[in-house]
Amino acid sequence: MDPNIARLGEWVGAAKRIVFFGGAGVSTESGIPDFRSTGGLYNQQYKYPPEVIVSHTFYEERPEEFFAFYRKRMLFPAARPNAAHRKLAEWERQGRLAAVVTQNIDGLHQAAGSRNVLELHGSVHRNYCEHCGKAFPLSYILQSTGVPRCDACGGPVRPDVVLYEEALDSDILEAAVEDIAAADLLIIGGTSLVVYPAAGLIRYFQGRHLVLVNKTATAADSRADLVIHDAIGAVFAQLP
């Protein structure tokens, strides 16, 4: 075993309150593309850049085009949890992991069995009518065409995800800050730490060990006590 992975395993074994903070790289091994990696959504060619399409302005002005892109490129109903999701759920069941803070919207942490999941950017599994507030599952979006319409009032149904130009949920952000501040081991995985305010959360960590697991270097590597440049699922599969 890689000595860095072995060291991480030792720290996990000794930790009383682990918090995991993850991004798109956590789900790439489940077949969901990362926005920023080579081959990710930002490097694929569209009429508009993906960050424009998944913006509040684009959603309001071109909802048909938004949903065409959203269904094709943002929804992966066949995706299943990988080794990283499963290991985190296992640690939570053992009482070692306090929370998962995620930038992902795919719901794979919950599918693996995690309960305390703070979804900074919302979830594709929650959708609601903008007029009457009625809730709808992911299947409703997948089975509809064009702009999904509420079966109760006819209003537009939108996903409960944070689009560009929209603010994060303040309650979820506050809970994430509290969990990170109370952690003795913070593991950051599968994120390039460039999207704010989410990336700024690590400054609240005051615990013993900060670990970064990411395929490529991040701006926070120098702050970490341990850095592992590898796929997170491959790393977590080797942990106790």
Q: What residues fall within each predicted segment?
A:
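Conserved catalytic core of sirtuin-type NAD+-dependent deacylases
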Residues: M1-P240
